[in-house]
């Protein structure tokens, strides 16, 4: 993993470093490190209010209400074809046995047949399973996954995006400090329900980037350096903050 840790982590000295808000911001650190921006800033660096609103408009967000709705969607880290296919395997794994790719594929197709799904659904399942198998092989080779460990969801990718939506809301003025703070803490709480540590979160996040991309190999090439750096660098928030489980910062 250290061989891939070639990125640089930057910090905003005015931003949170060790509290629950810092934990929330650290969940969006992959994109920030990739873009050479401070991981702990509430705003997007070097972006005017106008530029932030132009960016959000490109994602269909043109008002405070739109921003709130986009946050709600981002905070629902499940529901598409990728989640369904990974969730199907996760259910098979509840017996304590990890199914082979062949069994996963066969039982998924059997379920699709039994529920009268379309040929397109069968094709989508084949594409996703093949991509997941490739991605897990690359992750194991890079040291991101231990041999035999599988990706259970891409919720990390959605939560990372939710942090970005919160930040853009701050930069655009669509969200005031309290609204942005509450959004970030909601991301933090969800992360604690889905993952047990930064490593599991990291694998889910980069897998989501890869599976959403047209070229999953190129996406991994892009995001593996910031992920590896966050996992191993001494100055990383992922090394200096515990993962946000429920009781880290009791009120």
For each feature predicted by the language model, list its residue ranges:
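Polar/charged low-complexity regulatory segments
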Residues: 1-177, 182-251
């Amino acid at each position: 993993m250290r061989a891939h840790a070639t990125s640089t982590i930057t910090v905003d000295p005015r931003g949170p470093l060790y509290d629950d808000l810092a934990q929330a911001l650290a969940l969006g650190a992959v994109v920030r490190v990739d873009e050479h921006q401070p991981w702990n800033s509430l705003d997007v660096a070097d972006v005017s209010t106008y530029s932030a609103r132009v960016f959000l408009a490109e994602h269909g967000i043109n008002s405070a209400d739109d921003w709130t709705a986009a946050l709600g969607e981002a905070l629902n880290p499940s529901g598409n074809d990728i989640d369904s296919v990974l969730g199907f395997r996760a259910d098979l794994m509840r017996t304590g046995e990890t199914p082979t790719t062949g069994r996963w594929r066969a039982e998924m197709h059997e379920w699709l047949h039994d529920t009268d799904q379309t040929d397109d659904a069968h094709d989508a399942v084949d594409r996703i399973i093949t991509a997941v198998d490739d991605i897990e092989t690359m992750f194991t080779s890079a040291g991101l996954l231990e041999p035999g460990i599988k990706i259970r969801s891409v919720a990390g990718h959605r939560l990372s995006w939710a942090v970005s939506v919160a930040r853009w809301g701050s930069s655009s003025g669509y969200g005031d400090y309290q609204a942005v703070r509450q959004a970030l803490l909601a991301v933090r709480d969800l992360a604690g329900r889905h993952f047990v540590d930064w490593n599991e979160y990291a694998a889910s996040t980069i897998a989501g980037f890869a599976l959403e991309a047209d070229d999953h190999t190129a996406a991994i090439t892009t995001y593996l350096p910031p992920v590896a750096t966050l996992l191993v660098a001494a100055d990383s928030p992922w090394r200096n903050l515990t993962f946000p489980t429920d009781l880290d910062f009791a009120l």
